[in-house]
Every structure is written in structure tokens, then in C-alpha cells.
Amino acid sequence: MIPQWIPQNIQKRLLLYVLQQLSLFSEIDLPNLEEVSLNNIILKDVALDPEKVGKLPGCNLRYGQIGSLELTTISGISGVNIDVNDAEIVISPDFDIDENMTNQVAFSLAQSTANLANTIMLNTNDGSDMNETSDPASEDDDEDDIDDKITKPIPPKRRTSSVTGNKTTALGGVMQKAVEIALSRLSIKVNSLKIKIVSDLTDLQMEVDSVSINSTNGTRTVSIKGVKLRTLKPNVNPGEGFQSGHAPQKKQQGSDNDSPTDANKHGSENDNDDDDDDYGNESLMDSMVFSHEEASSIYMSATSRSFEKSAASGIPGEVDNKATDKEDYSEDPPIIFYMDDCTIEFDGLSTISNLEIEVGNINLAFTPLTPTLVSIFQGVAKSLKIKYYQQKKKTKSRSAQRNEKFPQYTNDNDEIPEDQSESDDASHEPFFNRFKVNSFVISATSALSENGLFANKNGINIIFFNINIKQKNELLLYGGVETFKIIRFEDDNTYEIFHFDKPQSAPSSAPSYSGSNDVAGTSSSLSSSTGSATSKADIRFEVFKKSEESDDLEVTVLMAKSAHFNFDLQSLLILSNFAKAVSSIYDEYGLLKSVIDKLDTRDKKWSGGTNNSKMSSKSEFILQTATIFVNFIISDDCQLQLIVFPIKFNLRQEQLTISKILLNCTNGDTQVEGVIILTDVSLITKNQEFRAYFQSTNTTTSANTHPLPRKTTMNSKLSVIVQKFSSNVSMDRLKFIGEKLKNFSNEFIERSPTQSNSLENSFLNEPVERQRLESSLHMNSSLFSTRRPGRRLGLGFNNSPSVFLGSTRVTMASFQVCFKEATFNITGVFPKFGNFSVQMSDISFYKLKNDILGHILSVSVQRKKGDLVENLIHQYQDLSPNSLEFPLLSIKCKLGDKTTKIEITARNLVLEYYTNWLLLMDKEESIIDAVEEEIIEKVTPSQHSSSQNKLDIRYSMYDCMVGLTPGRLSCKSYLIIGKGDSDISFGVDQFYVKCSFRNISMVLIDDTKNILPFSEPSTSSSSSSSSATRQTPYVYIQPLDYYSKLGYIHLGLINVAHVGITFNTDIEALKDRNEKLGIKDSLTFVDLKTNLDECQFNLCADTANTLIQLVNDLKLPLNFKDEDKMKVDFADGINVMQGIDQNIFKGLTETLTELNLNGTENGSTSESSSQEASSLMFEEGHFDRGNRSLYDNSHVDPLHININLSKVKIYLHDGYDWKDTRKAIRGAVKNFETAQTAKTVAKEKEKKRKVEFETRDIEVQEDVFQETLFQSIHVVAPRNQNARDMATSINLDLQNDKDGESRDVSTANSGKSYKNLKLRRSAKHKLLFDLKSIEVGVNVYSTRDPRRDKTDENMKYELLNFIELRVGTVDIYDNVSTSTWNKFLSYMNILGDREIGTSMVKVSILNVRPDPAMVSGEAIMNVSVLPLRLHIDQDALDFLVRFFEFKDERFELPPDEMVYIQKFEISSIKLKLDYKPKKVDYAGLRSGKAGEFANFFTLDGSTLTLPKVKLFGIPGAPKIGIGLGRAWLPVFQSTQVIGIISGVSPLRSVVNIGGGFKDLVAIPISEYKKDGRLWRSIQKGTVSFAKTTGYEILNLGVKLASGTQVLLEQGEEMLGGEGSSVRSPNLGGSDNRRNSNASDELPVEVAKPKSQNNLLVSSQILNKASTKIETHSYDTKKLYSNIELDDEDMDDNRINGINKELLSKSIFLLAPAEEKLAKLQPHTKGNHEGLTEEEEDEDEDEEYQLYAYENEEELQEKLVSLYSNQPETIEQGLKSAYKSLGTNFKLTKKQLLKLRRELAETDTIQDSMVTVLKNSPIILMRPLIGSTEAVSKLLMGVGNQIDGKKLVEKKDKYPT
């Protein structure tokens, strides 16, 4: 026992020295102490001195004050108790980069007071000064504890007290021992401790109710009670249930007044604290020694110094004391953390061992925690950057001065003492023993109340119960979480969102988990040594260290129980916002960590980087879970269950694997399994290579090609790979799930921002902070990271390493998600439809910088029903995914703060359209209405949405196709889109879709059975050409080439097409806008506008017929029932005789005879007579009057369509494209030949038995062979006609091929004349339809179906739609080779220029429903046509009739519902006609065809005026022609005969001259009546007469001269001259049409070797022909599918598809295939027995190689008229005449030279005379021809000079 005789002065000095040695307080000396008893000292309102506290690690003391401090000695000096009440400390973080910081932290205040007894008694001044540091949170805890091993006295760095003397006493040794014992039993107790942390962005306050520190036998026990952490700044959302109370106000008042009593009332929860506080307060106030003046002086000096130091610090933005911040803080700062109890036990002080921590209950409010942590991370990152720049400046200045002479000492660091200390402490007990937390609860929504409990009973809590961590030895650490669950509380009900299975029998689970641990390579103590608590834990883990020297760790986490998630809407709302908050915290932490890593890298660089010798640790982490079940409650009747099979993760392999993931759906009691199945899911965290594609930027490609994507290899830091994704669900189930998910997501999106724990509600009244929270990721990275790499490289921007690093950085993706295979099966789409199957492969998405990119290698969407498979979306060649060189779909998503752009690129995809699918769909639903409602619903902006992010979607397509499959025909067509772009943008009131397509081609085939097998091109030639043009390593086949090789015909091309679609979503807002702007246009829900630049089509008769029927069959057949078309009510019976006029037929004869058919009165008279007869009154303007008035304001049209076509050119070719058509025509001729052969054999037999006259009688009585093919080709021939003549007649009819007759005769075989038929498409077109400025407008007024929708009883009639067609200009060009005219039809330009905005043809159709209850409608049509000018050549007319009358039975469709035309009106039409007949059909004339009489007369300028006609009640459009014929026929007979007769060619001049005489009299009279000027009137009449008469006389002269020239040319040609061929561009010849005959002899002739000279000539001929064809054809190259030739020779239309460069090089000229030659050689020898007739016919359509034409005559040019290129003036006439004379004289000279050479070669006089007689006519006639031509040219010039108006017509009539 310690004796009680120690003097009071010594006790007082002991306690005083304890206070002085703390070095914390301001001036404290003996006079300042108040002595209460022998062993008590009480201080009140003592301020801490920041300077004496010194440097603290990581922070600075800004202010400190203690309300009361009581020091008590126990039993003399056997122990010291320190009681502190109401301690308040203010600190600020300091991130000073100091090299000695770690050394300062190593020392404690215990070392400075190690030998207090020596200091007190002996006053030793030896020792070294040391910096003293203290932990700010427990500054009074560790200062006075003494380690037994510390014996060296360390005097404090402080001035000596006045009480301390320099004398030594005899009691020194005894007192030293006594003081050591007393200080070793030090006991500290702190009540109501407040620590305030202030920084630039964040202020925190920690409140501790009590802290007690006791030492017992070397074991320190720290007990902490009631810890609260509050957020003072920023002003954050405290959470739900927070109520502002008076407790925080008391707290602030107590801190201001520094009253320990108030602080005790507020913060104390322990009973013993009350006694201590009461005792301390009473002792201090009743003290006899302590004076109040001294106390006030002590307090004032402390606070004044504290404020001075704080103010002098000068750190901007930091808070120095509470008084300055009190006004800015909330009255009730939210509590973010509460811990009720924490006990810490450990041994030792300088070396801590046997650490045990036991925590009671922890409650954490996550709502205020999120913005607090984000603000802390931002502030720390900002401060570190500032300190970094400061340290950098110091380092630069220091490096310039230090150790310049001894650089080896630059980076000295003494690490030997640390190694020795570590080796000395290795034998001690372990540092850590146990850590336990009873419960740790995180509330996602609730706030914390003052008592530490959650304020709101409702919400979601994340609970960790009984967390244990134990250390078995220095190498093994293990533990677990006994219970982990997530619970939602709502209205006193508890719902488990997440929980593990409850523990069952131990033997069932223990073996499997122990096995997994053995595989992991960890200790078996996880299951054996942890005890019963951890063996049943939900989460277990082990941390194993392989050896003491190694830093490698093996961490194993095992969740052996099955986990269950149960989510509903409210749970997902809270947890989703919770996840967003965690993500934001993680992002900010990542930015802070990046800053710290940058600083560490800089420090290593500045320190020399000598620490690289240590090997990087290779830790291993293993995670193993059981099956996870996730349930989503979408609605009351719909639940989704996600089953995740066990998860395995190995950090060393850097891979997480899941064998399978299933998604099931539960609807009531029905469960559908396998809705979605994911197989073999892998998460790879190491760098993984994958294949990516980038758009090539090659600019060397031609205009018609597009650069292909470039394949590259990239690396990804994080990869998710799914081997197979499969889904199988019915359409009804999919609709059900989709509808429920849609409602769920809409409600989720609507309610998510309003949640209290959302990021939007984290900050209160601080929009700046919220903005920084959302954009801090980009802001912080831009402040530091973006500027550093340039400096670290030490290279300029132009140096190569920078460029290289930049390129390497591009190839590293942040993450990658890949699906190797994906399959979707949707069953029961419609009852009759079948199933949908979607198959995709190699789906990859990855993030590159801030963009998300992806691709889908192959896509296939199919409809399956039974054995039927129909493709909807597929690759056009149907290649396997392994054969594809680039993806079919590419996706790029650009993420931005204001705009998100999604770019989708499609290549080589085909979208198929099947008409029969419309029949398979549900008829009860209106497709148009459903689509309309869906679109409006999708694009209608949400009123609750406040997001400013704009979404733009762009589609791009290259070489994509749209397949058109009719419903009842076997033909098929494809639209090939070369390039297309589509932009989708969302507006406030409207939603826009803008599309642009280029190079749209159309291909067609008559029957899908005729599709040929595709042959791959040769790799050598194709690859070389491909690499040269595209620079790609693989061969790419253009879709147009592909389909052409399959047998499709290229029909047309559209240059550019623009499509714009506008969806009006807010009609009321648009109405208001239109009213303000004065816009009167009607509004529509959908507005479609299409603009086509240039359209070109090449058609034959059969392809045109197929195309028209294909378009008709692309829609559903329109059929109405009788009850839908008419209403018949038999309720009251029907009186048949009611309403019948008995005298209806009485005056019929008189009425017809009184009809006046003259002029324009015809229509009105006929109408009135019919009205009188039928007693029906027609109101013509009934529907016109109410056209739009009913709908202008109240009604909104569903759809408006506007189509504008700038130019449309339709080339009509002769011949036929389809093989079946050609075979049918040849078959008819073949049948005739067969019948003729049989007839000839019969005749020969008859001749032997019968006399001659009987045979002649039989021949006379023979009938005629006739057959009509395709309703356009009429084959008529007598039975005795030669078959060869019949074939020639058909050729003349189809091709006008006269000169080819001789060649056909030479190559024809007996009985094989049908093979001489020329039936293929001509290389040149015959007619050209040139249409310009076509406008089509469609206004849909109603889509209502009376069968489904209700009908308004007050509606008298209903407008359905209005269609208007306008054609600005119509020109039909005549290109028939035998025709000399230019335009077949055009506007009558002689009338002058048209008015701007007028159209040549205008057609308007108004569809109405007279009875709104009926489905069928009626049409009201109005047609107006401008005056027309016609130049009709009979050959062109025959071709036109034959073209449009062509009908193929294969494409006949059943008639649709008849369109009833209620009213048809056509305006008056003026016509001026020229007609040139070529032949007369006498057979038709004999059969009664009166129209053949017109072929006897040539018409020139006949005028016709067709009056205005109105027709009513026309049953169908075909009846319109009959009605017009009946209406106009009387007009021809009565009024138009004179106009027609006046146009007869011989009478034309007479009529015109007669008109001149008429003008001589009529014009003066009319002019005199106007102004009374006689002389001027006579002058005008005379001028008009002279002009007319003179022009006609000159025109007669031109005709006589031209006729003479023609006769002379024909005579010269008969005598062997060149004739009219001199005027032709080419030297005559036949039509460019080869035989369709697979002739036997011709291949043998072609197979003979030709000289190279001939080949070159041939290629030049073809090149020339190609140039001429392109002048009237496509501007780009055309390609026709004529590879499968049924003609032996090459078809000329192939020329147009051959490159000119190849033609000029003559490299394509090949003989027929060797196989074909070998096959045909036996036929040339007459060996026909081996093949049947059918085989020969099939043989005609086999493939032939291309070879050149033998001569230039095979390319026939169009005949040139003598009236072409007329001179416009007399001067031009003289020049043309001189040129004509020169040309003909040159020919005469040439002929004379030829005669001279021939005379020189003759030997006899007879030969000379023959030569002279042979050439004399030509020599004599050629000058005459030149003279007549010169005269005609001169007269033309004079005539055109006189009357220039006639020249306008001649330019239209004759080609230039």
C-alpha cells in the first residue's frame, strides 16, 4: 500500500505536471488551480492552444475548448482520474505532403511523459526535443499512458514551471516509483465530446456521449458510448421521417454558453455521468482557492489566441470557429451515423497487441450520406491538387540546390531501424484477435432521430447481423456474417426483399461447401474452427497468407445458402436510387483514387523511383455462391422469376462464370418456364481481344460504290460473354408481359425522381451542388487528368510517341458485351400466321471513350408454319455467319450531356414483304388504326418528364433491299437501295422522320421457279478488281450483279428519293400556333412527303404487264358483301309499280331527235333530257360544296401524303424479256410449221390419185391459220403459206427488220423457221415517256370502318379521301427505227408558253360514302388536259397498241370490287394531229374495221376539239372509255369532220392558202371595226395574206424538192449506189436484234479463229453503239439479266451493261463455251436423232458466252428525215445548201476516182464499157441529188425566215 503521508503540495505538483506535459492548454500554473481537496483539481472553460498541440497527422487544430476538467488522484498517488465534460474541438483537414509525416505519427505523448518522477524531483534537462502528435478524435486518451518498457526520460518542449526547482531531494527514488505506479493506473473519462471537421466543401460534426479509457494490468479498455455524426454542410436531405425539434437548439445554446449542465442534459445516457458532472460543477463553484477572475482570464486568453491563430491561417474557404458558421448551418443538422456502444481492448501502447473490438448497434442513414461522401471526395481531391502544385514548386527549388556535389546522397532514406523493430516485434502476440458487430443497419430512405433510431417506420433497411472476424494465427483470418437481409417496412408489415435460406440440417450442406473450400486451397478451419455461429452464417470468408515474408493473400468468400430476392415497384424505386447513389459515390472515389495514384507516381519519380525492386503482390480471391432466385412482382397477376445458377469467381483467372440464367413468368397459377435462357455466361476482368469493325474512310471509290467496314482487333478491360441467348414465348404471353412491363416502367419513371432518396433530392436548396454531383465525373477529370499526360511524356504533340500512344488508346475498350448466338421464337403470332423465329450471331457491344459501339454479324427473321419457311429479314445471299466478312448491323451510341445520338448502319439486309401475311392477320383489328394509335402513344411527350436530354436516332443503309412478294402471282421483285440515311428527331409538339435514299434499283422476275443457281466469280479476276477498287481483302458482290445472275431483269433506277414523315403529337398546341401565325392549313396526325429526283424505267411488253399486275397484287383484294354495298329493307314490302311513269317511253323519239350535238351544248342538253325523262334532279355540287368545311376546325385528318417526282423517263422496248413468252410465240410458229408439214405430206399423197383441177379447188377453199398470242400478237396466214414467210412477217411486225430477211433465209433450216424469230429485248427503246413535275396528293379524311366503329346518326355523308394527280409536262418521243418523227405527243407549243403552275394533266378523285353506315364508297372524278400536239407514225402506233394490249394469262388476277364512279367530268381537249400511215390491213378492212380507211390518208395538222363531257353512274373505270366514245362520236360526225379533212396532206397547203385569202378580207374588217383606221387595217390583212401565202408556196417547193431527192436516192440505190444511207449516221443495216435461233451452223462459223483486226473493229462498233444508246438511256451503266440466252448470238441489250473500257480493250470477246460447241457440232452434221424436240427447245435457253458482231450493219440507226435540222434563217439556208452540194460533189469525185481505178484494171474494151455503164448513173445522179437537197434547204431557210412560229412545231416533229 502506498502510505498516505505524501504532502498536498506534491500531489498538486503531480497533477499540475500532468497538465503541463499534455502541452494542450494555455497558461496554467499553480495560482490558476482551484483546490477542492487533497487529491482534486477542477478547471473550467479551458481553451486548447493549437500551437502547443502541434502538428497533427492530416489535420490542423483550429479551435478547442473544454467546459470542465477534473483531475483526481486515487488513494494518494496510486492512480489518476481525468474527467472531461463538454469538450469541443474544431479541426480542418491538411493534406500537406511531408516526408517526415510518417515519423511524426510514430511518436506519442506517452513517450514525452515517460519518466515524470525524474522530471518532478530531479529536473533533468537532458534529452532531445521531439514533435508531439495526437489523434484528434481521442486526444486525451493516449497522452498519459506509460509503456513499461520506456525508461528514458524525455523532457517536454516547454518552459519550466515556476514551481519546479533545480534541487534534488532524498526522496527522489521513492517518488519516481510512486509516480510511475500512479500514471500507469491513469483513467480518462470524457462526457459530451464534440469534434467538428471543417473544410472547403464539407463540414461534419461528431458527437460522442462518453468515452472512457481504463488500464488494468497492462490491458487498455476504451469504451465509447453514443457516437453521432452530423452533416453541417452541404445542406443535405436528412431522409424520411425527419422532424425539426428543440434538441439541436439546446445543443447549440449549450455550446455557446459552455454550460456543462445543459450539455449533460442533452447528451448523457449513462447514469454515472450525472454524478460526475454534478460533483465537478459543485466543487468548482464552491472552491476557496480558485477565483472567478482568474478563470475568466484563463478562458478569454485561450479563446482569443485560438481566434487569432485561426484568423491568421489565411486558408480560404475554411471555417475557423463555430461562431462564424452558426448562421450558415441548418437548425437541425441531419444525423448520418449512429453507434450506441463500442468497446476496444488491447495490450501495450507503442506496440499494440491482442486488439479486440466489439461494436454494438450501428445505424446508417444513406440518404444524407451520399451527398456528404461526394462532397468529401470532391474537397479532398481539390485539396490534393493544390498541395501537389505547391509541393512541385518546392521540389523544383530544392532540387536545384541540394547535393550538387554529392548526388549519391540525394535520396537517402534510413529504413534499417524499421526492419529491426519489425524483427523485434515478430515474437509478440498477434496484433488483432477479434472484431464483432452485433448489428449494422443501413436505411435507404429513413432519417436518424436524436436517440439514434430510424425516424420513419416505413422504408428499406439493409441489415447485417452478428458480423464476426477472428484471427486464428498470423496467417489466417476468418469470419462471417450470420444474417444478411434486406427488409422493407410498410404500415407495420414486414417484407423481405432479400434473404438467404434458413439453415436446415447441417449434414446436408456441410460436405459440399467443405469440398469447395478444399478446391480453393484454403484452410479447413472455415467449417471446423469457426464454431456454430459462423458455420451457419449466410456469408463466410477466409483470408489466408501463404507465408510471413510474402504479401500474397488468398481470400475466399462462400455464400452456401440459396439467396432470394423479392422486388416490387416500391422496392425497385428505392433500391434503384440507392444503386445510383452508390454508383455516384464510387465514381467520385475513383476520381479521388486517380488523383492519389497520380501523386504517388510523381513522388516516386521525384524520389528516384528506387522502390521498383519489390515484386507486385498476386492476391487470389475466390467467390462461390449458391443458386440465386430473383422475383419481380410486376402486377397483381404477373410475376417474373430470374434464376441465376451458382456463381464462381477466381481473381487469379480473372473470370466469373455462371452456367445458366433462366427467366420464368407466372400468371396467376400458370407458370411459363424458359422465357429467356442465358447459357455459359462469363465475366472476364483481364484484357480480352475481340473483333470490331470500323467504317472505312476510303475516298477512292466510285460514286456508285460505298466503302465497306474495316475489321480490326481490339482489347477490352472488362468482357461479358454469353455463349447462347434463347427465348421462347407465345405472342399472347409476350403481349401480356409487354403491357405489364410498359405500365410498370411508366410508373417507375414517373415516380423515380420523387423518391426521397433519389439523387435529385440529395441536396436541399443547392442546385449548384446537385449539378456538381451529376457532372463531377467529367469536371474533375478535366481539372487534372486531361492535362497531365502531355507533360508526362515530355514530348510535343507532333512527336511520334504521342501519336502512337493515341492510336493505342483508341483500341482499348472499357468493356465489352458479346452474345455468340441469340435465338427468339415467338409462337402463335396470329391464329393462321404461325411462328416467328429470330436468329442472330456474334452480337457485340463495347465502350470506346464516351461512345458505345456494337455490331450484329448476322440477322435472320423467319416465319415458320409446319414445313413452310418464309424469310422476313435476312442477308441477301443467305450466307452462313462464318462466311460473312462484315456485320449486317452496326450500332454507335454517342452519349452526351444534352444530346444522345444513336447511329444504326445496315448492310446487305433484305426486308421481305408478303401480301398474304395481311390475310393471315387478325381481321378484327384495324391495322391502320392500331399503327396510328401506337405511334401517337409512343411519341406523345410526357407531361411529367423534365429531362432535357435530347435523343436523335439515325439509320444508315448500304446495299439493302426490299423484297416484294405478291399474294397470288408467282413473280417477285426487289428494290435495291444503294445508300440510305434516316434521321429521327423528337420535338415538343412534333416527331420527325427524315429519310434520304440514293441509287434505288428495281429488279423483277416472272416466276421464282426460273431463278438460276448462283455461281461464284473467279477468285483471281474478281479479287484483283475488288482490291483495286475497294481496297478490301475480300470479294464483294454487288446485289444488282447478284440478282442479275439469278435471272432477274433490271427494270429501273431512282436517282435520289427523300422521304419526310411528321407525326403531330400535340394537336391543340399546333392549332394555337397556326392561329397566331395565320396558317390555314388543315392539321393531320401523320404527314408524309416524298420527293423523287429522277426515275428511269426500261420495260418490255411482258415486263410491263408483270409489273402492273405485281403492284395490283401487293394489296389485299377489295371485296364487299352485298349488305355492305347496298341497303335493302323488306319490312314494309316493295311495290314494284310504284313511282313508274306510264308515259316514260312516249316522247323518247322526239327527245332524241331534238338533241343538239353541236359544240359545248351537247353535254348540257343530254343531261337535261335525261333528267326530264327520269324525273331525277342531280345536284352536281353537292359534295363539292361541303368538301372541307365540315372538317376545317373540329376534325383532324389521319393522314396526308404528298409525292413529288421531278423527272420520270419510261423507255418502252420491243421484244420480250421472259423466256416463257418467247417460247409461246415460237411454239405458235412451230405448230404452224408442223401442221404445214403434215399438210404438205398429205398433198403429195393426194396428187398421185387426184387430177390437177381438183387440187386447185381444194387450195382455193382452204381456211386461214390464225392465232392471237397474249392479246397483242395476231398471227394470220393462209394454210398454204410458207412457214419461213410467216416468221419473216412476225419479225417485220415486231422489229421492222426488212434487211435481215436475206440473212434469215440463208441460216434457216427446213422446218426450223420458228428459230429465226427475233423476240428478245431490243437494245434501243422504241418509245420514251418523258414526264416532269408529277405531283400526287392524298388526303385521308376518315379511316373509320362502319363494320367495327360507331356511325353518327346526324352524319348525312362521309368523305373518305381526296386524291389529286398533276403532271406538269408529258412528252412521248418516237424512237422507232422506221419513223422519222421526233415527238409522238407533246404540248401544243404553237399556242405559246404555258402559265406558270399549270399542268398538262390534272386528275382529282374524291371518294365519298353517301351512306355512312355502308362500307363501300363512290368516286367523283374530274380530269382536265391542256391542248395536245400529236405526231403519229403508224409503226409507232402499232407498237404502242401491241405493247399495252399485251396480256399474259399467268398474271391474270380475279377482278376486285368494282369502283362505282358517281360522276366523271373531263374538260374540253384541243388536239392537233399529224398521221403517217405505212400499211393497210385489207383483211381487217374486209372484216369490217372502218378505221383502216384512215391508213389511206396522210394527215398534216388536222385539228380536233373534244368538248367537255360529264358522265354519271359509271360502273367501273373500264367503262369510262365506252362512255367517252359514245359522247364524242356524234361530235366527230357533226363538227370535227372538216378539221380532219383539212389535215389531209394534199389539201393542207390549199387550205392554208385559202385561210390566207380569208385573212385578206376578215382582218381589215375586224381591225377597222376596232379603231376605224382603214389603211392600217388593209396593211395588216395584206401582211398576213402575204406571209401565209408565201410560206405555203415555199413549203410546196420544199416538198417537191424533197420528193425529187427521195426518188433520185431510191433510183441510185437500185443502181448500186449508197442512196439515203449517206444522210444516216451509220451505214444502214438491220435492227440491232440477233436471231433467237440457236442455229446449228453459226457457232461453227464463230468458232473459227478471227483476225485480231476484226476483233478490234468489232469492239469499236460495240463501243460506239454503247455510246449512242446511253444518250437516250440511263445516265449510269445498265445491266440486264441476259446471261441465260435462248438466242445463239449475243443480244444487243447486253452492250449497255458492258464497261466502255473493256470494250475499247477488246478483252471480253469470247467464243461460245467449249461445252456448247461440242454439243452443237453433231447437229451441224445433220445428226438430229439424239435429241427430242423438247430437249432442243430447252437447249435454246442455255448460257452462251459473249462474242463480237462481225460487221457494223448489225447496229441500225433511226432514219433521218429530210425536214430535220431546218435552217432558221436565209443565211443558215445558204450555208446548209452549200454544205449539201459539197458533200454530194465529194461523193461524185470519189465515184470518179473509183471508176478510174476500175478502168485501169480492165483489159478489154468490153470490160471498160461495162464499168462505165455501171458507174455512169451514179455519177450523174449524185450531183442532181445534191442540187435538190440544196434547193430544199434554201427554201426552208427562206420559209422559216418569213414565219418563225412554224419552226416551233417542226422542232417537236422532227428530231435534231
UniProtKB/Swiss-Prot annotation:
Residues 1157-1170 have a biased composition (Low complexity). It catalyses: a 1,2-diacyl-sn-glycero-3-phosphocholine(in) = a 1,2-diacyl-sn-glycero-3-phosphocholine(out); a 1,2-diacyl-sn-glycero-3-phospho-L-serine(in) = a 1,2-diacyl-sn-glycero-3-phospho-L-serine(out); a 1,2-diacyl-sn-glycero-3-phosphoethanolamine(in) = a 1,2-diacyl-sn-glycero-3-phosphoethanolamine(out). InterPro entries: ATG2. Residues 250-262, 1621-1639 have a biased composition (Polar residues). Disulfide bonds: none annotated. It holds the Pfam family ATG2_CAD. Residues 137-147, 270-280, 412-424, 1732-1741 have a biased composition (Acidic residues). Residues 123-167, 229-283, 309-328, 395-428, 1157-1177, 1614-1647, 1719-1741 are annotated as: Disordered. It is a peripheral membrane protein. Keywords: Autophagy, Endoplasmic reticulum, Lipid transport, Membrane, Protein transport, Transport. Its main location: membrane. It is found in: Preautophagosomal structure membrane; Endoplasmic reticulum membrane. GO terms for cellular component: endoplasmic reticulum membrane; phagophore; phagophore assembly site; phagophore assembly site membrane. GO terms for biological process: autophagosome assembly; autophagy of mitochondrion; glycophagy; lipid transport; pexophagy; piecemeal microautophagy of the nucleus; protein transport; reticulophagy. GO terms for molecular function: phosphatidylinositol-3-phosphate binding; protein-membrane adaptor activity. Belongs to the ATG2 family. Lipid transfer protein required for autophagosome completion and peroxisome degradation. Tethers the edge of the isolation membrane (IM) to the endoplasmic reticulum (ER) and mediates direct lipid transfer from ER to IM for IM expansion. ATG2/SPO72 binds to the ER exit site (ERES), which is the membrane source for autophagosome formation, using basic residues in its N-terminal region (NR) and to the expanding edge of the IM through its C-terminal region. The latter binding is assisted by an ATG18-PtdIns3P interaction. This is Autophagy-related protein 2. The gene is SPO72.
